[in-house]
């Protein structure tokens, strides 16, 4: 383990990101989000009024000083590719800055699509090697968080690790969804189990387990060697969590990086924020939290901006209708191009170009871009997919049986509405 002075830290914080390439795994479908991911990959799902989920990993890279990135895509990638081409094309190739799109092209075998997260990198090794990076940062493109990867890179170098895994405590009842680890006093990982049925607890807190966040830093040459070995292993599922990390742990070369050390937050006393918005309820809840008075995730931090594609739109407009009813909002996010006419919107998130017509009541709802809400509608505890046309007088979120019959209703009572569902009910979706 190497001990560094403050000046050395500052120098490494500048140098290490320049020696690194980030690979963002963005090919997942996100089946737990149900019909919301029927036509788009989970990283391309809208979030927070104007962003896509992948914008958080990409913005973290830029803000951390990493300006060489590869985005590995597979499932329903068109929307994601289009978003990156439109919103992330500002890099200077002459300065060796880029975002490479790496779709599944069956390069290595001629038969297989990506068989697992590790195989997604293996199939692109010929391209990745050309980057000539010293360190490779592996990221999931479907999580919401703010992290300074330069701090994790410093931790990796200080500990003399070949592989570093970002981790954080999670409630033990939720830990079966993650890789779970045990560490020694120097943060060396001494045990790693992927998605255990009975997750082990932390020694100092029996109510929690130490979970992998799916964020890794590797020495580049070591990673390439591991991937080639794994590709030859016919018994491997070719996955980082299931195969590579346990193998590295057994060799004594994996270290843990506590997420609070690199989490970026405006309030140092706040709990570190990281969300896998993989279920409809988690997605709905994380969006609505941004509309609260003091949200858990600070989106207004000028020192750590979240970038995205910014369409040229007019400002949001709140107008009274012909009867004199005023368009009003409270504790809500309303994006550009929206028009609220003689209706009330409370504790909701409205993405761009949403139109809410007269006499409506919108409460605790997430409306994706270009949704049209007809007159006299009541929408509660719901997510309305892009470009849905909600017919006049429709009520959603007040009758559990009716919601479940017409749409998708989660166990927690969150209703998902899509254009296809509305068409099946006989409602035209063209305006």
Curated annotation (Swiss-Prot):
GO BP terms in the entry: glycogen biosynthetic process
Organism: Escherichia coli O7:K1 (strain IAI39 / ExPEC)
Residues marked Could play a key role in the communication between the regulatory and the substrate sites (site): 74, 113
Pfam families according to UniProt: Hexapep_GlmU, NTP_transferase
PROSITE patterns: ADP_GLC_PYROPHOSPH_1, ADP_GLC_PYROPHOSPH_2, ADP_GLC_PYROPHOSPH_3
Keyword annotations of the record: Allosteric enzyme, ATP-binding, Carbohydrate metabolism, Glycogen biosynthesis, Glycogen metabolism, Nucleotide-binding, Nucleotidyltransferase, Transferase
GO molecular function, one term: glucose-1-phosphate adenylyltransferase activity
Binding site for AMP: 40, 46, 52, 130, 370, 386
Catalysed reactions listed for this entry: alpha-D-glucose 1-phosphate + ATP + H(+) = ADP-alpha-D-glucose + diphosphate
Binding site for beta-D-fructose 1,6-bisphosphate: 39, 419-423, 429-431
Lineage summary: Bacteria, Pseudomonadati, Pseudomonadota, Gammaproteobacteria, Enterobacterales
Name used for this protein in its record: Glucose-1-phosphate adenylyltransferase
Function as written in the Swiss-Prot or TrEMBL entry: Involved in the biosynthesis of ADP-glucose, a building block required for the elongation reactions to produce glycogen. Catalyzes the reaction between ATP and alpha-D-glucose 1-phosphate (G1P) to produce pyrophosphate and ADP-Glc.
Pathway assigned to this chain's UniProt record: Glycan biosynthesis; glycogen biosynthesis
Gene field: glgC
EC nos: 2.7.7.27
Family label: Belongs to the bacterial/plant glucose-1-phosphate adenylyltransferase family.
SUPFAM superfamilies reported in the protein's UniProt record: Nucleotide-diphospho-sugar transferases, Trimeric LpxA-like enzymes
Subunit structure as annotated in this protein's UniProt entry: Homotetramer.
